[in-house]
Structures are given as structure tokens and as C-alpha cells.
């Protein structure tokens, strides 16, 4: 078969017309060095600060240093097989994590990937890990309580929904225990919880997850994990990921509680990244923006007003305020609260619960030091009955501390001083509480009422805990309706006062402790 020139030219024109060229513009770069999880890239002219950079093998790095002739990026995950000359691409996206109710009851890593072996995570979409905190106009004052279940905290250092309350102390003083008990106490409160574990041993985290499951609190909690064996980048980003997951509930008119355990390790991970990126070191070798590291995280914990929620949900949720309450944990060295990171976080938060190793070792647990622990905004949120009955507790403890110091040097004490010392010791004993045993508002009120109204005066110090246990058992058995009424209303009036007095009088008459 012979084709003439006209047919050939027509065929060529037809093929040219059918030829479809798809052009894609990629912003590509080349790795010029790999060192301790930090890669230097040449050629990414249009990269953004914080942008995800696609690496070979379905991995990502985050651009942190934008320099004149190169980009410094931190690899999220293993980097041993990365080498000079490899090609990388800009993605045009910043880091996002899955958010939604499907994450409740799950254990995930910094990127929101499940690590509990329960299959894929169901989510309602993705949210950027770095978000701007709500402005002043979008906020509402804190006036609803978060009950931790600890008498000493709820009575003297109350926490409100939308507050940032620092938990600070040396290692092994019960910081994590306090935070975990606060999460366990939210089982029936409707508050969703997020627990962020940074730089801890995997065995410790597994134990925490098991305890949450045992006490029925895991179904209400998201656990975000960046263990000590993971890269500094994942440890640095874990609190931001957890915060994004908590903000999902805040922005939809619900209440959430987030625990950062702990921010000291996050600061150390960020210091490591900054030094490897050759950023100039400052005090304690931390970079200059370590304050901003924590302030931009903790400012996202807030109580937002109904207008903000309605606007965010496009009118789907009306008349509801949302909140995200933060309990950041900081570990001190030998009780030094004036170190760089502790002072930073103290100045950012709305108060601190200071746990002392000397109190912990003396058997006073939770080891709260009421002298330097404070809640700056929680007073307005405190339950009415607890607020009324706890007024004299802090004063009694402060006087007891002062007199106890002087009584070591004085041989003979007058009756009034001896009485104050005795009352202070009994209040200290009454505020002791076992782990994983949070108390309801009614139970706390009953204990505080007994101390406030002098029912402990004729009880021996060694018998105070037995007295309280027997009192609560008696109240549950004989006056369950009164406890239920106090738990539901949280109010305090002459009628409730009379009922509490009658309850304690009848219990004292039984002498059964």
C-alpha cells in the first residue's frame, strides 16, 4: 500500500491535533546535606515558612530556616536513607492533622496516625497544627468550673473552663497523676480530653492508657504520643497537633481539656532543632523564640463566645460557648522555678499548681504547696458551695505553716497557738487523697464542712482519714438524696447548711470511725 504526500501530511496533522501535552510546574530542589535529621536544600525558591516538603519514600520535612541560598528543613521520621543529590518538592501545604469525634478513644502519633492497632482513624477532616488564637473580641470570661476531683485543688486553686493552669514540680512529685485524675474525673462531665505525651518512655505511656481504660475515661480521650525514641521534630510538634484536635470541640460549642505532659521536653526538642539549624543560642542555649514557642500554643486555650461558635459553624450551632482548658506540665530541677522555661510558662499561664518533693516524701499527696500555688481567674468559676466552705482552708494552712516553723524553737506554746497548730495538722491530713479516687462536689463539700465547722476538733490526727472515709460511706448510705442535690445544683443556702449540720451531728453520734 502506497501513501501519497497529501495523505501523509494529513495523517501527521491529525496526530499533532490529537497529541495532548499535560504540563505540570514543580518547585523542585536538591538535597545538599543531611545531618542529624536536618536537611539543607538548594533550589526551592518559592518555599513558605512551615511548608511541608515532599521527600522520596512518601515522607515529609518541614521548612524552618529560609536562607539566601538554601533552605533548612527538619525531617519528620527516619532520615538514614536520605542522601545528597536527591530531589525534593514543595507541596504548597502546611502540616495538617485529622480531627473529629472518631479520634476519641484512640492513641495516635504526632501526625494523627493510629498506633494502637485498632485500625484506621475515622475523622471529620483535617486542621492545620499551627492556628492563630482567638482574638479578645471572640473570647468570653471564665465562669464555669473544671472539677479535678482533688479537694486541695478544687478548694484552694480552682480551675475554670478556658483557663491555662500550670502544673509544676520536680520529677516524681505527682504531676502526671494529678493531670490523669483530672481526665478521669471528666467521665460524666461532658468535657472531652486530649492527653499529649512528649518525650516519655513508651512503657510509661502504655501504663497511662491502661489506667484511663480501666477507669472508663479512654472513650472520652484522645492520646497523642511522641515518645523519647522519636525524632525531635515530632516531639516539638506533638503539643500543636493535640491542640488542633482539642480546638475541634472548642470551635463547635463544646468543652475540652488538654494536658501537655510535658512542655520542658518539648522545649528541649526545639532547642535541639534550633541548634542543629545553626540558630544563635541564648540563655541556657535555648533559641530567642522559646517564649513564643509556648505562648502561641497556650494562647489557643480559651473560652470563646456564642457569636464565634455560630460564625465558625455557619449558624449550625447557636447560643453555645466553647472552651479549651489547658494543663501544661513543667518539670523543675531541684525546685528551681526561676529557670528560663518555668518562668516563661508561669508568665503565660493563668496560675500554677506547685508540687513539692518535700511534701510528697512526707506523705502529703497531692503534694500541693498552697503558699505559692495560685489560680488567677478560677475563683469566678468555682462552685458556690466549695467556694463558701473553702474560705478558711487556705488561711488555716498558711497560719499552720508559719506557726509550725516558729514552734520548733519555742518550748512552751499558749493554748490558742496549740489549737491553731492542731487544726492546721488536721486540715493537712484531710486534704490528703489517694490516686485514681477523684471526689464529687458533694463529697468535697462534706469534708470541707467538717473542717470548717470544727467537727474535727475532738478527732485524733491519726484518725482524720478514717473519720472522713466513714463519714462519706455514711452519707452515701443514709443521705444519698442530699449528695445528689449538691452535685446537681452546686449551690449553698441555709437549708443545705442545716442538712449538712444534721448529717454530721447524726454521724458524730454513731462514733463509727
From Swiss-Prot:
Entry keyword Cell inner membrane: yes
Localization in the cell: Cell inner membrane
Gene: atpA
EC annotation from Swiss-Prot or TrEMBL: 7.1.2.2
Keyword annotations of the record: ATP synthesis, ATP-binding, Cell inner membrane, Cell membrane, CF(1), Hydrogen ion transport, Ion transport, Membrane, Nucleotide-binding, Translocase, Transport
Subunit details: F-type ATPases have 2 components, CF(1) - the catalytic core - and CF(0) - the membrane proton channel. CF(1) has five subunits: alpha(3), beta(3), gamma(1), delta(1), epsilon(1). CF(0) has three main subunits: a(1), b(2) and c(9-12). The alpha and beta chains form an alternating ring which encloses part of the gamma chain. CF(1) is attached to CF(0) by a central stalk formed by the gamma and epsilon chains, while a peripheral stalk is formed by the delta and b chains.
PANTHER family in UniProt: ATP SYNTHASE SUBUNIT ALPHA, MITOCHONDRIAL
Taxonomic path: Bacteria, Pseudomonadati, Pseudomonadota, Gammaproteobacteria, Enterobacterales
Site positions per UniProt: Required for activity: 373
Species of provenance: Photorhabdus laumondii subsp. laumondii (strain DSM 15139 / CIP 105565 / TT01) (Photorhabdus luminescens subsp. laumondii)
Keyword set includes Transport: yes
Catalytic EC class: translocase
Family: Belongs to the ATPase alpha/beta chains family.
Biological function: Produces ATP from ADP in the presence of a proton gradient across the membrane. The alpha chain is a regulatory subunit.
Reactions it catalyzes: ATP + H2O + 4 H(+)(in) = ADP + phosphate + 5 H(+)(out)
Name of the molecule in the record: ATP synthase subunit alpha
UniProt: ATP binding residues: 169-176
